[in-house]
Amino acid sequence: NPTQGVKPEDMIRHLMGEDLKVGCCLTWGPCFDFQKRFFTGDVAEQSLYPYTLRYDVEVSGFGSHMSGHLNLLNLEDQIYPGGESKEHWPTLGLNTLRWAKKQGAICGPAHSSIGLTNFIGRLENTEAQDGENNLPNFQIPAFDGIGANEFIVDVTHQIPGPTGELIPAVDFISTMNTERVAEWNMWYHVLNCGFRVAACGETDFPCMSGERVGIGRVYAKVDGPLTFEKWIQSIAKGRSYVSDGYCHLLD
């Protein structure tokens, strides 16, 4: 890995090489104080339409990261009030979400299945109730990692949005870059409980997946010319689907 991260002029070339129209480059714990200079609260000037690059934040190596890493997209401000770096952030993910959603961010957990693949048992009286291909299943995860751990609590909350209206604390669950049965199982159970949360494609490059960007992709329906704002709002509204990019043509 680069010692201080990948610069925007390099990241836009990765997007173009994989024909990704939109890429979110997330500043995280290691090298945060170097990478934070690339955040502008808008698309990066290196973007070459339709290839659009934007810098935002993954809460990883921060105060609340043990509750599960969070992807905070479409931020206006990248640093939680009270400091200039990453050490002073809340220890509870929901408090980070309250701050992010107040400024109009679209949020969800990163690398969701980390912490969901070790089991401590299963729900009683659920034998023979697992679905086809083990989806959904009723194994109880240990929640012992940095994925969608606090997610199942946060998804039940509504918190104030930019104008004070109550909106969902979580917009999506990240998928496609970690163990997929565990990712989809969490999503299925949340949907079955009545919470409408989108699935979002993810590639944790170059930390977890050094092969290439675009291993997990999210395709969003937008009206008119593509912009980052239209794309991210379509994901929040569920006007999207995920794919690995190999079979994505729909009529």
Give residue spans per PLM region.
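Extended, charged catalytic domains and RNA/DNA-binding interfaces, predominantly
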Residues: 1-251
